[in-house]
Amino acid sequence: MNSYKHPLRVGVGGPVGSGKTALLEALCKAMRDTWQLAVVTNDIYTKEDQRILTEAGALAPERIVGVETGGCPHTAIREDASMNLAAVEALSEKFGNLDLIFVESGGDNLSATFSPELADLTIYVIDVAEGEKIPRKGGPGITKSDFLVINKTDLAPYVGASLEVMASDTQRMRGDRPWTFTNLKQGDGLSTIIAFLEDKGMLGK
């Protein structure tokens, strides 16, 4: 019987360049003094995101593990999540007292989802620079994720995107499911995401 604590597992997905790694860096730095954290990153042929988070000092290096999927990033979080499951278990056993493990997917598209065996909660990240039409395009990441992040609000004036239109479309596509705008450079929206994780993830309960 496993003697270590079973942490909350949070899948973080979204297209390449949407800000997944930046979000993880911000979340880790904001939460690490309160909760015991670790991160599993996914890249196809490298461990680039692991390196970025480590060099940014998001967490101690031994708390950040990179998985090289060697193929389609969707498969590693959905159909065959064995490498990620093994990394999560190894971290859980190594530290024994983890409260939360973030699992960052490789760059994916709007149809990618996490296996329920791998993630207890899912956060999906899109960004304003992709255009104001992105929320209404739908897809499981936008409509079914437990929490949707619309990042880079500071770029809206430069790409001609209306945050009001994006908010209206997001509300229509998601119904009661929570979401927020973020500008991670300024920390805008971060507290909303943390409150969601602590509440829905029942951290400390």
Swiss-Prot record:
Entry keyword annotation includes Zinc-finger: no
UniProt keyword annotations, A-Z: Chaperone, Cytoplasm, GTP-binding, Nickel insertion, Nucleotide-binding
Activity regulation: Activation of apourease within the UreDFG-apoprotein complex is inhibited by zinc, copper and cobalt.
Biological process, per Gene Ontology: urea catabolic process
One Gene Ontology MF term: GTP binding
UniProt family annotation: Belongs to the SIMIBI class G3E GTPase family. UreG subfamily.
Protein name (Swiss-Prot/TrEMBL): Urease accessory protein UreG
Species whose genome carries this gene: Klebsiella aerogenes (Enterobacter aerogenes)
